Amino acid sequence: MNTLLSRANSLFAFTLSVMAALTLGCILTTAFKDRSAPVRLHVSRILLKKVEDFTGPRKKSDLGFITFHISADLEKTFDWNVKQLFLYLSAEYSTKSNAVNQVVLWDKILLRGENPKLNLKDVKSKYFFFDDGHGLKGNRNVTLTLSWQVIPIAGILPLVTGSGRVSVPFPDSYEIATTF
């Protein structure tokens, strides 16, 4: 009749088809879920320095430091198909030389099983907030936004922006303080 290899091939093909159908079912059950959540951001301190920029010509550039609070409940974002969330806080502003500037200031990976309720106080920016020039000094509209990338077990990777944003003005003068 059939050889052992042809029976094994049939079993493998059937198993692969069933696994593909189950994966498609997993994707369809969570593909259209709203993953947004309300976010509260508060900036408690802004420090602006004029520092040497070693990446280009020997000019000085603006370096901003931000201390902030984040409050968000991401519990409804997690379901059985979510492996982790990649959270990041970004700053968006415009200058004379660039219409749109976007800088990531802080990030965090939130795994399934960890506490999805964020209540972080006095968090300092994790990454440097450099502007290639002097676009931060006196800028009245630097908008901070918390966003997250949903990493599912199976399916697409949706990018979600939290509903809370905060716009902060930067100071008109540079700080001389040595520590932040």
Curated annotation (Swiss-Prot):
UniProt KW keywords: Endoplasmic reticulum, Glycoprotein, Membrane, Signal-anchor, Transmembrane, Transmembrane helix
GO BP: fat cell differentiation; protein targeting to ER; signal peptide processing
Highest taxon listed in the record's lineage: Eukaryota
Side of membrane Cytoplasmic, spans: 1-11
Main localization category: endoplasmic reticulum
Transmembrane portions of the chain: 12-32
Record carries keyword Transmembrane: yes
Side of membrane Lumenal, spans: 33-180
Localization per Swiss-Prot or TrEMBL: Endoplasmic reticulum membrane
GO-annotated cellular components: endoplasmic reticulum; signal peptidase complex
Entry membrane topology: Single-pass type II membrane protein
Residues modified by glycosylation: N141
Subunit structure: Component of the signal peptidase complex paralog A (SPC-A) composed of a catalytic subunit SEC11A and three accessory subunits SPCS1, SPCS2 and SPCS3. Component of the signal peptidase complex paralog C (SPC-C) composed of a catalytic subunit SEC11C and three accessory subunits SPCS1, SPCS2 and SPCS3. Within the complex, interacts with SEC11A or SEC11C and SPCS1. The complex induces a local thinning of the ER membrane which is used to measure the length of the signal peptide (SP) h-region of protein substrates.
Function text: Essential component of the signal peptidase complex (SPC) which catalyzes the cleavage of N-terminal signal sequences from nascent proteins as they are translocated into the lumen of the endoplasmic reticulum. Essential for the SPC catalytic activity, possibly by stabilizing and positioning the active center of the complex close to the lumenal surface.
Family: Belongs to the SPCS3 family.
Protein name, per record: Signal peptidase complex subunit 3
Lineage: Eukaryota, Metazoa, Chordata, Craniata, Vertebrata
Gene label: Spcs3
